Amino acid sequence: MTDWIDGQGRQIDYLRLSVTDRCDFRCVYCMAEDMRFLPRQQVLTLEEIERVARLFVAGGVRKLRLTGGEPLVRPGIVGLCERLAALPGLRELCMTSNGSQLVRYARPLYDAGLSRLNISLDTLDPLRFRAITRNGELDKVLAGIDAAQAAGFRRIKLNAVVMKGRNADEVPALVDFAIARGLDISFIEEMPLGQVGRERGESFCSSDEVRALIAQRHALLDSAEQSGGPARYVRLVEHPQTRIGFISPHSHNFCATCNRLRLTVEGRLLLCLGHEHSLDLRALLRRHPLHDGPLLEAIGEALQRKPARHEFSAAGEVQVLRFMNMSGG
């Protein structure tokens, strides 16, 4: 097989791999405060994750992203990065992190071959940061960003989930922070995954509203740039080195060009973030430890069932009970 093609004719060249459901934060949009995590036997081993990645890269996937939970709380993560970075045909090995562990891990990750880092940063206010993350320390994340730049990472992007009443008023300040640090930043519409104990519809902030906030202070230039993910980009006329992205699952969904799949840490291959359609790869991995044929056949059949689009609603109703940390955030 040379290409993974789904039932809509879309080429799949991007796989997100969740290496853990655990996290040292409890972000309000990601999980419940009293989240219960998976027992070890239900979690894929690093060897199983590597095996899946190897199969997909051999079949045409060119970009892998390691996610969580927080991937840096998984023991052995640096060694996994080193092995994945060496896969023939892989062009990009990326990671999404909350940044709290990067003072320790930035240099080892860079040396292991990680090519890109996305770092979550929803606010620059320490008290708000603790409220959104429920227990996080902003200073650790800011130090982690510094450590990543010092380690040599040149392709660092900040991710901010924008919520009215929590951090929407900080959009301009976050842009200014990205400019000052020479970083890109993407603003994300909150996704209705899991019961998080509050009304999402009341805090929903669309990408168009975020763009309008930025345009009050900066002249924007639309860009046709693509990163292999769902973001639409603009450049700042006076600071063209900073790229601003908008990830808009509600207001400007990107389903028609969807090129990605997600593997959860329990081994479910999610065909769409907004649907429960999935393939139990863990069972196949453990039933066929020496033979890839059954896995390849099952993946090919599953791809034909990948939905044309999600059904997310900006009204805030939960369409998927699975939490974001269980989905590969």
From Swiss-Prot:
Q: Which residues bind [4Fe-4S] cluster 1?
A: 23, 27, 30
Q: Where does this protein hold GTP? A: 16, 65, 96, 157, 260-262
Asked if the keyword Cytoplasm belongs to this entry, the reply reads: no
The pathway noted for it is: Cofactor biosynthesis; molybdopterin biosynthesis
Q: Which residues bind S-adenosyl-L-methionine?
A: 29, 69, 120, 191
Please provide, alphabetically and separated by semicolons, the GO molecular function terms listed in this UniProt record.
4 iron, 4 sulfur cluster binding; cyclic pyranopterin monophosphate synthase activity; GTP 3',8'-cyclase activity; GTP binding; metal ion binding; S-adenosyl-L-methionine binding
Highest taxon of source: Bacteria
Cofactors required: [4Fe-4S] cluster
The UniProt family comment states:
Belongs to the radical SAM superfamily. MoaA family.
- Protein name, as recorded: GTP 3',8-cyclase 1
**Taxonomic source organism:** Pseudomonas aeruginosa (strain ATCC 15692 / DSM 22644 / CIP 104116 / JCM 14847 / LMG 12228 / 1C / PRS 101 / PAO1)
Gene label:
moaA1
